[in-house]
Swiss-Prot record:
Subunit details: Heterododecamer (2C3:3R2) of six catalytic PyrB chains organized as two trimers (C3), and six regulatory PyrI chains organized as three dimers (R2).
SUPFAM superfamilies: Aspartate/ornithine carbamoyltransferase
Pathway the protein takes part in: Pyrimidine metabolism; UMP biosynthesis via de novo pathway; (S)-dihydroorotate from bicarbonate: step 2/3
GO biological process: 'de novo' pyrimidine nucleobase biosynthetic process; 'de novo' UMP biosynthetic process; amino acid metabolic process
Protein name: Aspartate carbamoyltransferase catalytic subunit
EC number: 2.1.3.2
Its biological purpose: Catalyzes the condensation of carbamoyl phosphate and aspartate to form carbamoyl aspartate and inorganic phosphate, the committed step in the de novo pyrimidine nucleotide biosynthesis pathway.
Alphabetized UniProt keyword annotations: Pyrimidine biosynthesis, Transferase
Length: 311
């Protein structure tokens, strides 16, 4: 069967249809069950991280190795020609694309990955995060985790808590879940970090239910998924950060009355928005969620680099 993701740029979660999302998730489930250590043998993938990352970079590079491919790249752009000599991103991507079969890229500037795709020829760009904009592979592992724990991606009650303004993970996840049916979103954030208007407008246009809240306590009994986020210090001025950083903290006592199937997710890193006593509850699933990144990213890379793939 022809693979619709072959050589496709993955810049935004909106680049993927529901059918394509489900294809990635089926492939991820297959790879989790049955590893394929030679699936990308002889392929070379560039890991270009212009912004600090731990989980995403290591997850991608582990995924690449476990599929049998080789990885080249950098985790500190200050030591590259772009950082030291002023080379443009366009020229950097034009050159790197002559060396490799695919490029995984994180950049602090919104839209940088889509710009890179204009100069990479037929070498696919996979966006590993561009500023506060999109983080599509985090969304894929989030969807995989929700499906794994709930058995479905339709009719999910999900609360998103914390920094909904700058948190690219919640933007992408909301857009992805909007492709499925019957989902209800509970947005819990201070006014300074509220979900952007364009996301709310998208939900309204699709007639998808959402509600805004100031308290976590009032919605916990209704939830299937509780998606916590950290306040992103690097994207706020110090006075704003000080005002909001501790406004929403999840403690194990807050989960009294939760449904048995509730899972608490977090894109990590965690700072102090989830206390460690939550780790010991049956609701905590954020470390397993991070581990699922291996399978979601393996699936995406396998599909992007194989014209036909049947696992």
């Amino acid at each position: 069967m022809a693979n619709p993701l072959y050589h496709k740029h993955i810049i935004s979660i909106n680049d993927l249809s529901r059918d394509e999302l489900e294809l990635v998730l089926r492939t991820a489930a297959s790879l989790k069950k049955t590893p394929q250590p030679e699936l990308l043998k002889h392929k070379v993938i560039a890991s270009c991280f212009f912004e600090a990352s731990t989980r995403t970079r290591l997850s991608f590079e582990t995924s690449i190795h476990r599929l049998g491919a080789s990885v080249v790249g950098f985790s500190d752009s200050s030591n590259t020609s772009l950082g030291k000599k002023g080379e443009t991103l366009a020229d950097t991507m034009s050159v790197i694309s002559t060396y490799v079969d695919a490029i995984v890229m994180r950049h602090p500037q919104e839209g940088a990955s889509r710009l890179a795709a204009q100069f990479s020829g037929n070498v696919p760009i996979v966006n590993a995060g561009d500023g506060a904009n999109q983080h599509p592979t985090q969304t894929l592992l989030d969807l995989f985790t929700i499906q794994e724990t709930q058995g479905r991606l339709d009719n999910i009650n999900i609360a998103m808590v914390g920094d909904l303004k700058y948190g690219r993970t919640v933007h992408s996840l909301t857009q992805a879940l909007a492709k499925f049916n019957g989902n209800h979103f509970f947005f819990i954030a201070p006014d300074a970090l509220a979900m952007p208007a364009y996301i709310l407008q998208m939900l309204e246009e699709k007639e998808i239910e959402y509600s805004l809240h100031e308290s976590l306590e009032e919605v916990v009994p209704e939830l299937d998924i509780l998606y916590m986020t950290r306040v992103q210090k690097e994207r706020l001025d110090p006075s704003e950060y000080a005002n909001v950083k501790a406004q929403f903290i999840l403690r194990s006592s807050d989960l009294t009355g939760a449904r048995d199937n509730l899972k608490v997710l977090h894109p990590l890193p965690r700072i102090d928005e989830i206390t460690t006593d939550v780790d010991k509850t049956p609701y905590a699933y954020y470390f397993q969620q991070a581990g699922n990144g291996i399978f979601a990213r393996q699936a995406l890379l396998a599909l992007v680099l194989n014209a036909e793939l049947a696992l």
